[in-house]
Amino acid sequence: MNKRQLIQSFLAASALSFGLAPAFAQTPTPIKFQLDWRFEGPAALFLHPAAKGYFKAAGLDVTIDAGNGSGGTVTRVASGAYEMGFADLAALMEFHANNPDSPNKPVAVMMVYNNTPASVMALKKSGITKPADLTGKKLGAPVFDAGRRAFPIFAKANNIGAVNWTAMDPTLRETMLMRGDIDAITGFTFTSLLNLEARGAKTADVVILPYPDYGVKLYGNVIIASPKLIKENPAAVKAFLSAFTKGAKEVIANPAAAIASVKARDGIVDSKLETRRLQLAIDTVINSPDARTEGFGVVNAGRMALMASQVSDAFNTKTRVSPDAVWTASLLPPAAELNTVLRK
């Protein structure tokens, strides 16, 4: 070996040892990730760690796309179009129970919204002040709305009689309430409240009946993964959850700064509005009293079993929901990592 070849061999070996040469670097694992909704405040939970390079540092090439509802996200992960996603746990349970023979049913791998964000909202002038006042009223929501789907659970917990439902596109829900076409709506609090304000309502004039405050302890959104990815590359799922956890801690600590990642993906968003939306989500469903009691990322077995039973009944599923089939804690980061996320 001549002197030039010796130097080249030394440089190549050095590059391999220190990870400096792309030619020798390990190829990142691609993961397509589907959100539950548009690029709004809560999307910062995922866009922030991506922008900070946490997924990349974990050996992942993560692509994050906006969604159009949890049901669609579950279906797309089940179809193989996406490896992972963010979706309402009730929607995942419904898919499992209605598609028992599906070979690729997604699995929840981390709890993010410890409480459902669903609530009933009305204007004070309607005279609605408590759940019992909803009996006989006209309620409105898109047919796929999580609050509407789970309303039978809310109604049973609060002895609400029959109500009349009106369906509409999501963009018309709050408008129809403001016009008086309907008496109340269901929706995620941090979405519908801000939408009502944007249409001229004052916060003080809006009555909010959050499901968790009225006896409905449903879990909300979870990170889901395809069973194929879990089986073939569990290390990738673990790496994703660890990077997400690191980012989530920063988002919760400084929501205003994290919104920059949302603005970068959708330049027309109102940063001030989305910061408020994110803060509402943090306060009501992410860093909620229930979340601080149970811990970030995990679930309570008894509460999960109750939800599975409630969803089976309320959604009239083909088969009963099996809690063990929809959830696994085996890929979560260590408790030492998870326990640093929430502010006490």
Regions found by a protein language model. Give the residues of each.
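Conserved C-terminal helix/tail region of periplasmic/extracytoplasmic solute-binding proteins
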Residues: M304-K344
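Short, glycine-/small- and polar/acidic-enriched structural segments
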Residues: A25-R179, D183-F190, L209-Y211, V216-K217
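Periplasmic-binding protein-like
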Residues: V112-A122, K202-L229, L241, L280-I286
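Short, surface-exposed acidic
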Residues: A162-W165, T203-V206, I268-Q279, T317-V326
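N-terminal export leaders
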Residues: K3-Q8
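Secondary-structure end/capping motifs
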Residues: E232-A314
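C-terminal segment of classical bacterial N-terminal signal peptides
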Residues: L16-F24
